[in-house]
């Protein structure tokens, strides 16, 4: 089983704020996510600028595309994104359109599982050639005190068994990682637990060490 990658979510409102994080920890992570908040705040230039600074890193545009899949994904890929996200409630043709464009750029599409979705939809995504999903505990759910539970682990295992590469996100803390041991997680996303740590560098390194211990 390969080691899960570590992704930092830049859900900053400005590039200046995002750079405060990347200057410290860009070299400690595998994937740099231009979070939805940053996408809205700064547009696709955020993707372009971060990829120019870190060409050796995977840069994800977390656009959560809901419609106009070809247009929006092309905007992201022309800004040199490696991956883009499509929200799970989008029509299957939106996801297909985004994937078609991704292939032109040797990129990839992730389905963001935020909110309601069904296993029938999951099968449609696989049938369409989608290979990545993001299992997401929402920011608002976290704020309401919703913790990771057995239902989450069962769903993640089932998605993996379907052939998806699964990314896990949603207020992920270091102590949560053992919950997922034994599952071939593709990526763990850490946002505030790294960005807001007293030492973001050490926080990122702790995540990497724990991943190596649990999946190595």
UniProtKB/Swiss-Prot annotation:
Gene induction: Induced by L-ascorbate. Repressed by UlaR.
Names of the cofactor(s): Mg(2+)
UniProt remark on cofactor binding: Binds 1 Mg(2+) ion per subunit.
Pathway listed: Cofactor degradation; L-ascorbate degradation; D-xylulose 5-phosphate from L-ascorbate: step 2/4
Gene Ontology terms for molecular function: 3-dehydro-L-gulonate-6-phosphate decarboxylase activity; magnesium ion binding; orotidine-5'-phosphate decarboxylase activity
Top class in the EC scheme: lyase
InterPro entries for the chain: 3-keto-L-gulonate6Pdecase_UlaD, Aldolase_TIM, HPS/KGPDC, OMPdeCOase_dom, RibuloseP-bd_barrel
Keyword Cell membrane: no
UniProt GO BP: 'de novo' pyrimidine nucleobase biosynthetic process; L-ascorbic acid catabolic process
Alphabetical keyword list: Carbohydrate metabolism, Decarboxylase, Lyase, Magnesium, Metal-binding
Swiss-Prot/TrEMBL site (Transition state stabilizer) positions: 64, 67
Catalysed reactions, as listed in the record: 3-dehydro-L-gulonate 6-phosphate + H(+) = L-xylulose 5-phosphate + CO2
A family per Pfam: OMPdecase
Binding annotation for Mg(2+): 33, 62
EC number, as in UniProt: 4.1.1.85
Sequence positions that bind substrate: 11, 192
Subunit (UniProt): Homodimer.
NCBIfam families found in the cross-reference section: PRK13306.1 (NF009832)
Similarity comment text for this entry: Belongs to the HPS/KGPDC family. KGPDC subfamily.
HAMAP family noted in UniProt: UlaD
Reported function: Catalyzes the decarboxylation of 3-keto-L-gulonate-6-P into L-xylulose-5-P. Is involved in the anaerobic L-ascorbate utilization.
Protein's name in the database: 3-keto-L-gulonate-6-phosphate decarboxylase UlaD
Gene name as annotated: ulaD
